[in-house]
């Protein structure tokens, strides 16, 4: 999770939304500062370094997805990287310190979501990282800073008042801000708690507190540590092979199977012969975008992902560039797509499926179904493919040596004595190093 999150974060520093968030954050200054990933000459206060790095992670919707539904790592890892670097060098934070705080931040998100049946499904009202991510960020920061139980309770109460962003901003440049804000507000909540600011001690237990985000929120007393089972041990985490909403990955898998019936050898997909394309998918309105007009809309379009897979036989980062979205062949295929929502196909990442039927003008119909895609927790990416994804994502910002060192460090994080070894690599090469590398 950590390696994948770093990789998509590096890749995200090339996006327009990252540059806008970065420019905004430059107006803030502080004697205490942290690294903006891949930007060796830029440092920001830890709250804003966490903000822009969080935005980068979610800027392409390429980050991990957990079940119940949220993106767990993007709100937590930037916080821990920023704090471990900004705080005094003594005592040093070890890799084990980082891992423990990371696990706490993930666990808090999972526990809160498990108190609601609504959280199991693809969200309709609030974007989960803006809700549970903010609490996970505060919990992780509390852990790595060694807050007392009382101050940790205060921090979580404060964080609840920072939580929540509507799903209406999905498929826009504002959606990545949800992740950045979750990271930033978690740190701010902890800093305010350390100054003595108080909140409602029962905020996590009431319908007017955290329950305001879920219609059937029913918190329970957690078991003692002696009998405690970590949710993360279940490893219900999906890692994406292309940057788009997770539900579209079932569509891509099914479309790839149908394409094998349509394309032989190296011939092109016969779009002129296609009469109709039917996608049988869950009813998820914010991923129903018949004619996407931007990269963010395309990442949230069942229709677009199906058409690109049928046309190209694969989906990559560049598939969502503007000139790819506006290709005449894509627009022609989009006009032929219809959606159906079978009653048994619920909007749930653990149970949903995609069935696609392509009917040709001669009457022939080809149908394929995807129940699980490669990258889902039931069919996880191999370590080799995870590392390949990281290399592809990070190589545009880091040297080959730094990329390989990061892979080794993250793989042995529990044995790392000083996290500054890790954070120093996140900066990217300095201007002088870039010149020497090009010679």
What do the predicted segments below correspond to?
Residues 1-70, 174-184, 191-439:
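Terminal-appendage/accessory-domain detector
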Residues 6, 76-86, 102-109, 134-142, ...:
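Buried hydrophobic packing segments
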Residues 48-100, 104-108, 112:
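Function-dense linear segments that define catalytic or interfacial modules
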């Amino acid at each position: 999770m950590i390696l994948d999150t770093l990789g998509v974060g590096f890749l995200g520093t090339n996006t327009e939304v990252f540059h806008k968030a970065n420019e905004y954050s430059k107006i803030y200054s502080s004697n205490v500062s942290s690294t903006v990933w891949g930007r060796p000459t830029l440092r920001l206060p830890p709250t804003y370094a966490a903000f822009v790095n969080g935005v980068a992670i979610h800027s392409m919707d390429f980050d991990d997805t957990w079940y119940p539904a949220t993106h767990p790592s993007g709100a937590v890892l930037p916080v821990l990287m920023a704090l471990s670097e900004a705080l005094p060098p003594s005592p040093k934070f070890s890799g084990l310190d980082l891992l423990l705080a990371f696990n706490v931040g993930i666990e808090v998100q999972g526990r809160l979501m498990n108190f609601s049946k609504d959280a199991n499904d693809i969200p309709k009202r609030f974007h989960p990282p803006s809700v549970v991510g903010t609490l996970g960020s505060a919990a992780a920061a509390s852990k790595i800073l060694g807050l007392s139980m009382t101050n940790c309770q205060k921090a979580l109460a404060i964080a609840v008042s920072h939580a929540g962003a509507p799903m209406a901003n999905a498929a826009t440049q504002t959606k990545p801000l949800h992740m950045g804000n979750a990271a930033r507000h978690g740190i701010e909540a902890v800093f305010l708690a350390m100054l003595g600011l108080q909140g409602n001690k029962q905020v996590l237990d009431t319908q007017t507190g955290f329950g305001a985000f879920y219609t059937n929120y029913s918190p329970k007393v957690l078991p003692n540590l002696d009998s405690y089972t970590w949710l993360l041990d279940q490893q219900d985490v999906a890692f994406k092979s292309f940057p788009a909403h997770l539900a579209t990955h079932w569509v891509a898998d099914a479309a790839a199977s149908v394409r094998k019936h349509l394309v032989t050898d190296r011939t092109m997909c016969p779009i002129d012969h296609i009469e109709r394309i039917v996608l049988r998918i869950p009813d998820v309105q914010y991923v129903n975008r018949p004619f996407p007009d931007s990269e963010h809309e395309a990442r949230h379009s069942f229709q677009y992902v199906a058409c690109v897979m049928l046309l190209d036989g694969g989906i990559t980062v560049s598939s969502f560039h503007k000139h790819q979205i506006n290709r005449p062949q894509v627009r022609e295929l989009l006009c032929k797509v219809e959606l159906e929502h079978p009653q048994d196909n619920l909007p749930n990442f653990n149970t949903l499926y995609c069935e696609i039927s392509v009917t040709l003008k001669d009457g022939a119909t080809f149908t394929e179904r995807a129940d699980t895609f490669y990258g889902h927790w039931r069919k996880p990416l191999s370590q080799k493919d995870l590392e390949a994804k990281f290399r592809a994502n990070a190589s545009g910002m880091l040297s080959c040596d730094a990329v390989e060192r990061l892979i080794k460090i993250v793989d042995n994080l529990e044995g790392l004595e000083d996290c500054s070894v890790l954070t120093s690599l996140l900066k990217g090469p300095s201007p002088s190093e870039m010149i020497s590398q090009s010679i």
